[in-house]
Amino acid sequence: MADRDVQARAAALRREIERHNYAYYVLDAPTIPDAEYDRLYHELEALEAAHPELVAADSPTRRVGGQPLAGFKPVRHAVPMLSIRTETDTTAAGARAFDVRVRKELGLAPADPPVEYAAELKFDGLAINLRYEAGVLVAAATRGDGETGEDVTQNVRTVRTIPLRLHGDAPPAVLEVRGEVFMRRDDFERYNAQQRAAGKPTLVNPRNGAAGSIRQLDPAIAGQRPLSFYAYGLGEVVGWPDAPATHGATLDALQGLGVPVSAERCVCNGVDDLIAFHDDIAARRDQLPFDIDGVVYKVNAFALQRELGFLTREPRWAVAHKYPAQEQLTTVLGIGVHVGRTGALTPVARLAPVFVGGVTVTNATLHNQDEIDRKDTRVGDTVIVRRAGDVIPEIVATVLERRPQPEPPRFNILQSYPVCPECGSHVVRLEGEAVARCTGGLYCPAQRKQALLHFASRRAMDIDGVGEKLVDQLVSRELVRTPADLYRLPLETLAGLERMAEKSARNLIQAIETSKSTTLARFIYALGIRNVGETTARDLARHFGALDALLGANETALLGVRDVGPIVAQSIAQFFAEPHNLEVVGKLRALGVHWPETTGMQQSGGILSGKTLVLTGTLPALTRDQAKERIESAGGKVAGSVSKKTDYVVAGEEAGSKLAKARELGVTILDEEELLALLGSNKKNG
């Protein structure tokens, strides 16, 4: 037998670990570092291993483990776990109908005071009955048929938010706590991400994840699932002399005993408060960290609950007021694609019409090829479609047991859509990307607005006056199909557009004309090649010097450009391999868009090649962007901070800490005049 000191230490460790468990899992406010928690836990494990007689039913070490079960034993509930009635009207009228029934049963006149109710969430998980004797969790059972459930004690012990021992010195002799085991959305997503990374099966949704975990025959598997629990009522109670007289006070008391209770609850004075609660939760439903399918109203006073009694298997004093379902079953009638403004081809399932999330849904996104493969969704399949709030409906799972025979073929975007359905350009899927894309960025109608706005933007062709509203008009009236069409717009056409008088039209024509004289770097950036930003565009311009040299470069040649990797090289090569894009580039050149060209760094390096510069302060003549462009055109790199690797710091007025750092490190400091002198022999590269 262990001596008293060992017994006392084990008991103290159990209390301390459970206190930290409550703070971490229930309050979400850890009180000690993980390493210290692990030290306490391992100390208790070692004590119990050395003294098996010390192992108690409420020990934290008993949460996870145990032998796999052959099956679940039936458990008869001391107090039946009855279901509550569901109000079919999901509007405010549903709450009013419940209030009318309650007041009628209680014999209240219209002039009598309002009934006090308790309102709470209807969690979307698995109902569980927890039995505590002398404050220790001794059994847990599912609802079952209401009279008899299944013994899931071993699995429930693995749920970290469920206390194995109640707080307080004088718990009731018997206390049955009823509530819901569920899975938070973030825990669900995190678990599925880990499963996918390990190549293991994922869970369909949080509800199935919670129910399936509790009904695992192997408690070790249940212990790996991130489950949570909230209490919402009582079963059998013995020896609780100061038991509360209302439902709301009971939930407060349970919280005081260490049992998790949702904060999303209130005591309501009459039906108007119920409706306000219902509407408030409805507005925030999608922001809650877990799934719910409605709210529950209960007459608050237990004395009135007893007076109202039951109707067959349902209490007259409670009702579930549901929201429109966010998930439903339907059938996939076909799979097509939607071409987005960036050229992404998103697979879309055409569905047999189904009412979900308050609307009739006929289409749902399948996201990308990886998601189609993961869910194995095919035409003819029965699927679970979800629509939450304003979120685009999506297919969350395929019901494989209902797949038609013979099995329909798998869907593959590149096989079904080798060319873009909008413009006929080639469709590709870059290595490492989940999305298939149209390569006709300058030509594709679906990408037209985005391509035009990017082409005219300040850092690209810098056409002042070309904004979203103008582009909307130009595209909707079919005046512009590609960027080349901007250079053909007549004055009278522009002057006839909304909010475009003749003076504005003349200014725009002048801006378009001015933009014809540009730099090769700006022109490359303006083309909107995927993965090619300003810096890469400048690197390409410096390296090749001339557009024709770039057009003739294969992926191997592109990999020779500074900071261009395989994905960027592939993206550039595929863009210029698309005839539609080359056609637009040719038209732009024919319409007078031009730039200075050089032999490129393939044959001659820039004067600042391999040098790193830092800009600080305000320069007298050059803007920061202009200075950066000149430096990069000369082969230099502009960094954001000063280090030992910095070659020059260019300082203007009100230079700050970067200048001080440069002096400290002995870095050469230039003013604007000295920078321009250094760049003097490289002006032709701008």
Curated annotation (Swiss-Prot):
Q: Which reaction does it catalyse?
A: NAD(+) + (deoxyribonucleotide)n-3'-hydroxyl + 5'-phospho-(deoxyribonucleotide)m = (deoxyribonucleotide)n+m + AMP + beta-nicotinamide D-nucleotide
Query: What does the record list as coiled-coil region(s)?
Result: none
Describe the location of the BRCT domain by residue ranges: 603-686
Known PROSITE patterns for this protein? Answer: BRCT, DNA_LIGASE_N1, DNA_LIGASE_N2
EC number(s) given by UniProt: 6.5.1.2
Q: Where do the catalytic residues lie?
A: 122 (n6-amp-lysine intermediate)
Sites binding Zn(2+) sit at 420, 423, 438, 444
The identity of this protein, by name, is DNA ligase
Its lineage reads: Bacteria, Pseudomonadati, Pseudomonadota, Betaproteobacteria, Nitrosomonadales
Q: Which gene encodes it?
A: ligA
